[in-house]
Every structure is written in structure tokens, then in C-alpha cells.
């Protein structure tokens, strides 16, 4: 029974297609209105302003911006001097902050220094503020304040876990 319905539906579709093709209205081509099509194309362009002739004329008249390589090299050298680790050593020479930060730099002594700081109640933001005094100091000791912040977070999580275990055991 279902097969008959399928055959009837296919025959109806095919007869509709055949009559549509035979109809003379469908064989005529419509004229293209050029003004409307350009408006439609401009709607879909992402950057109409770049294709505008007036803007390109202004860019051509202005010309390329000349780059002064000597000034650029001088600025790059100045920037490298600003973040030089030797400058950080010179700035912190003879301070207790330098000895503490130098002790926290190697991986082996880092946890002992962090535990001492945490026991003293040092906040990670205070270490961050002390290190961010100068770009050279920040570059050299960035790992210290980042690792100390992570150390404090993990120590706080461990402390909370112990408190929760203690509550559940009581």
C-alpha cells in the first residue's frame, strides 16, 4: 500500500515539473537592474571604505611614512638596558630584599623561603609590589612572585582540607 503512495507522489512531482518547464513564463530571462545590484553588493562588502576612490587618493597623496632606523635602534637599545638583569642587581645591591629574592630564585631553596614568608604572614601582593618597583627587577624576579602566589594558594587549600577533615572526624 505504501509503495502505491510513493509512486503516486513521484508521478505528481514529475508531472508538475514537466508542466513548469513547458510554461513560457519560466523560459524568459529577467533584465538586471544595475543600480540595485551594486547596492546589494556594497551591502555585503566588509570594507566599503577601502574600495572608495576618494580615500585611496588621499592615501596616495600622503605617501609612505619614512622610518628612521637610527632612532628605532636607539629605542631598542634603551629598552634592553631598562630590563637588563645586571641593572636589577645594581638597584638592589646591599638590600635584604635582594638576598631574600636571590634565595628564592633556585628551585631547591624556593619552598623553604616561601614557607618562611608564609609563616611571617607575608602577602603575595606585597611581594609583587616590591618586585614591580622597576622593570629590570620585575623581569629578573617575576618567577618568584608568581610562584609565591601559587604556593600561598596551595597552602591555603591544604589548610582548608585539614580543617574539613577534622570536622568530619569529630
UniProtKB/Swiss-Prot annotation:
A motif (Nuclear localization signal) lies at residues 157-167. Induction: Expression is induced early during infection of P.infestans. Belongs to the RxLR effector family. It comes from Phytophthora infestans (strain T30-4). Residues 1-22 form the signal peptide. A motif (RxLR-dEER) lies at residues 43-59. This is RxLR effector protein PITG_22798. It is found in: Secreted; Host nucleus. GO terms for cellular component: extracellular region; host cell nucleus. The keyword Disulfide bond does not apply. Pfam families: RXLR. The nuclear localization signal is required for the localization into the host nucleus and the ability to induce host cell death. The RxLR-dEER motif acts to carry the protein into the host cell cytoplasm through binding to cell surface phosphatidylinositol-3-phosphate. Effector that enhances P.infestans colonization of Nicotiana benthamiana leaves, which suggests that PITG_22798 contributes to P.infestans infection. Triggers cell death in Nicotiana benthamiana. PITG_22798-triggered cell death is dependent on SGT1-mediated signaling but not HSP90, and is suppressed by the P.infestans avirulence effector 3b (AVR3b). Keywords: Host nucleus, Secreted, Signal.
